[in-house]
């Protein structure tokens, strides 16, 4: 039987999927996002960056077209019920209206593809567009890339490469995501200075290190700017974004001294992961106002943060082996069942490949992050002490992520390993 291929596009970090990654250590369970990230780290030669949310959005738009064992395997990879959701809090609340934050999905289909009415109803009337994959592959790829660039603030370009596409591709599913937001508690540019960052290989590099005092309580003055975490040698800090309801949280986590990043990620349990997320995303519910007779400023909890100013971007990452390693195997083979989606008469559809590309910039005033994904078918250890509070400097490799606590969704995550020594990150 001949199969036509669908193309799904994902925007991830710079990883090559030549091998299926080993399973986690026995007894170490992990949520889907962490399993995915472990797989990405296997072939990485440096910093890693992915957008779990962008990948999952593409799979959610594929799932209504899947049936049988293919549907079961895809649903098992996805967090939650796997259904298409249009009411994400970070995209529909106060935050999305005050900051630049959006996510879009599009299905590019050749005119030879017959999509079923039930599938088109499930994905929405505006989700499908035509592209001439059979007649002019280069033009179809140009249309996909242009759409991805437009919907990521022009940060993601050339998502698809015509030379990497199957000549039997007739359909591509794409997600594009863009976030530009400001810290609730901003860094002062005059406080940024070059400081030493030590890579895992022992090389010492100079990076522009931002600095600020972050209050962990208070809603007016002082204003809560983030949270601090310390347990079993693991230290972390978070920074909140301005924007109100639905605002995600930026988090950075240092492994225990002497532990390699991969060893730290591979050994993390689901309980530890959830503890870090819940502790670092806890916003202060108390109405605190400094006024005569009120609590003195020095009695507020706080921590002192030094964080590199950095940028990361990834080349296009192939996700096929990663998804196969997570149990989604049939969709890429002749066993694929996308009968609920449609066909390229008289041939059924299967997935040929999946690709993702990401970019992020962390600055004194805030950050911007973008991702695009395409699919191709052929507990807290306690509050910091009162007074001055602890100091935390991210001067060695760390894990970072952007997390939506109300949606329980990891939007972006990555590791920062530092620049190549001799290659400057930028002036302070």
Residue ranges and their predicted role:
Residues 1-2, 17-136, 140, 146:
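Detector for small/aliphatic-rich hydrophobic stretches
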Residues 5-14:
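Sec-dependent N-terminal signal peptides
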Residues 19, 23-36, 367-389, 424-428:
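Short, positively charged
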Residues 30, 49-53, 68, 167, ...:
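Conserved structured core elements
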Residues 84-263, 283-385:
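Non-catalytic, conformational "gating/processing" segments within enzyme and secreted inhibitor domains
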Residues 173, 230-231, 235-253, 383-426:
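Extended hydrophobic
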Residues 271-275, 428:
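Soluble, non-membrane globular domain cores that form compact, hydrophobic packing
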